[in-house]
């Protein structure tokens, strides 16, 4: 749940790389929720992509597959609360920041979390502003995934 600032606000961070395009990097900020992402279940154990075992209490079972994976390294309650506070803090600094559109709006309209967190052409092309995830603008990314606690936090913004 610790927030780390990587560079000053007045600098442009090309946080989406070559695939993400310049337009969206210019008009967006990047926040990274640190974890190992998807997990592979082998027997009754769960493993990260680097073959490190994850204890069951740190496993999020979505109950469905998101980007081909059902099991994920869970975000902690502290991470989700820190993210919520950071989003609200950034909204205070940047009043034009759009929290009404993007993933929160889709979730509030009843779109299934799996779909709300998927690639969105309008987000990718910077045609629809709002709160998005790496997965909204990159087909090769796995963060963020729709963990129930994260979904509920975003719906509550």
Q: What label would you give each PLM region?
A:
Residues 9-10, 34-35, 51, 101, ...:
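Detector for Asparagine
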Residues 42, 100-101, 105-109, 125, ...:
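Polar/charged alpha-helical tracts
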Residues 1-96:
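Active-site-adjacent loop/helix surface patches within enzyme catalytic domains
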